[in-house]
């Protein structure tokens, strides 16, 4: 154990602080002027999980779903002795009480599943708390740089900590499923996210990690190129001050990987590039839903789609003026469902070259796009169940449609597809008899252009 000794004349009210790697290990205030030697035991040269507050605060750790704190978990206040950490016990720190440090040797971190876990809470919402240190010092504080994190989870550890202003370091490159699930959910004072260097992800690893972090303005870099199911799902959901999105370099996606990732981020002005050409089920579902400051969409290069891949991707993006090209010729069920629903400033629709359709493929695709004046040509000869259902519903300025189907017998394929569009305009249809209609007439719903 290393010792630090300081000899000198200390003035009344003087404070001596010992910091290691910018982390305060211990501090001492002198009540009166004195000349003496003060010594500190530097057993804590490790970057323990450290909490700092300017005024008195309390920290309590609770457990859920039969979870039991690992016996190795300990805490120390103001550089004092290490004491075993117990659940439901309030620990006072901050201000004159000094910092609070945690350490442990728990291979599982603070959880064994997404529900069986420990959770930190602070007693005074009006006293802000800064957290620093390396989260791996809870896994093995003596060997934190080399310890395996293959089983370490910190699910919901800071859930609802509205007074938390900064996060600990999360340098692990080996992740396990649900490892950071909802870790900072509803941490409304968190302004900076930790670095996330992992390049290979695990199922649900970052799911809802920063959800409702309403003070977060910049997202961390996300260098991963190997994704996993739901890895980024809801990651920045409702981060209402987020202005900048990270680059997303992966070219092969996983089911639900970006689902709801930036849902209702109204200050996000630019979407990241999306280079992936191999898609997965619901991969981009609602990714930018409600991003009302988004004016341009990223390029979407995939030519073969997956089920629900673009479902509601830009729904409610009211300032989006131009849609990306959609070159895919091989569709999937619900692939474009509600993709631009409610995009009230969208003036031009992309070409839709596919001739073989799938159920619900264009379901409500342009629903409520009130600035749209012309529809893309719809070349498919045979329609399928619910394929064009409410596709242009409520597009009040739409006055030009070309739909070349010759078989419209599928269930619901044209239900309300042009309901609410302009009462007159240009409609172009196939020259041959349209199967499934009466006398070759195209059903319109309650209103619409067709006659043709």
Where are each of the predicted segments found?
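Short, intrinsically disordered N-terminal pre-domain segments
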Residues: 1-15
């Amino acid at each position: 154990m290393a010792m630090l000794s300081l000899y000198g004349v200390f003035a009344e009210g003087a404070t001596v602080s010992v910091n290691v790697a910018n982390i305060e290990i211990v501090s001492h205030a002198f009540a009166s002027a004195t000349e003496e030697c003060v010594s500190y035991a530097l057993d804590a040269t490790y970057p323990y999980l450290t909490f700092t507050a300017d005024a008195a605060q309390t920290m309590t750790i609770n457990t859920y779903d039969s979870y039991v704190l690992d016996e190795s978990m300990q805490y120390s206040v103001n550089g004092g002795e290490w004491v075993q950490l117990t659940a439901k016990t309030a620990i006072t720190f901050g201000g004159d009480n000094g910092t609070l440090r945690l350490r442990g040797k728990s291979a599982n971190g603070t959880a064994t599943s997404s529900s069986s876990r420990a959770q930190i809470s602070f007693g005074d919402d009006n006293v802000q708390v800064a957290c620093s240190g390396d989260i791996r010092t809870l896994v093995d504080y003596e060997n934190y740089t080399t310890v395996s994190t293959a089983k370490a989870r910190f699910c919901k550890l800071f859930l609802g900590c509205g007074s938390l202003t900064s996060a600990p370091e999360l340098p692990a490159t080996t992740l396990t499923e649900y490892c950071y699930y909802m870790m900072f959910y509803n941490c409304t004072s968190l302004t900076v996210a930790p670095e996330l260097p992992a390049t290979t992800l695990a199922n649900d690893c970052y799911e809802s990690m920063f959800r409702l972090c309403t003070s977060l303005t910049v997202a961390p870099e996300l260098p991963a190129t190997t994704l996993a199911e739901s890895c980024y799902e809801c990651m920045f959901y409702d981060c209402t001050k987020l202005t900048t999105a990270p680059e997303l370099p992966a070219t092969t996606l996983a089911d639900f990987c970006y689902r709801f990732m930036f849902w209702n981020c109204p200050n996000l002005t630019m979407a990241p590039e999306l280079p992936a050409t191999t898609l997965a089920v619901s991969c981009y579902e609602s990714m930018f839903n409600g991003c009302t400051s988004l004016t341009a969409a990223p390029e979407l290069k995939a030519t073969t789609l997956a089920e629900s891949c673009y479902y509601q991707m830009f729904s409610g993006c009211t300032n989006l003026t131009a849609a990306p090209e959609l070159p895919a010729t091989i569709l999937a069920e619900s692939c474009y469902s509600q993709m631009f629903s409610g995009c009230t400033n969208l003036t031009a629709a992309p070409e839709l070259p596919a001739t073989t359709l799938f159920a619900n493929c264009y379901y409500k695709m342009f629903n409520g796009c009130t600035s749209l004046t012309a529809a893309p040509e719809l070349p498919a000869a045979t329609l399928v169940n619910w394929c064009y259902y409410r596709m242009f519903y409520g597009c009040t300025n739409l006055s030009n449609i070309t739909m070349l189907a010759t078989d419209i017998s599928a269930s619901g394929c044209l239900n309300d597809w042009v309901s609410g569009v302009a009462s007159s305009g240009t409609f172009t249809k196939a020259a041959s008899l349209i199967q499934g209609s009466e006398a070759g007439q195209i059903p319109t719903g309650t209103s619409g252009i067709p006659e043709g």
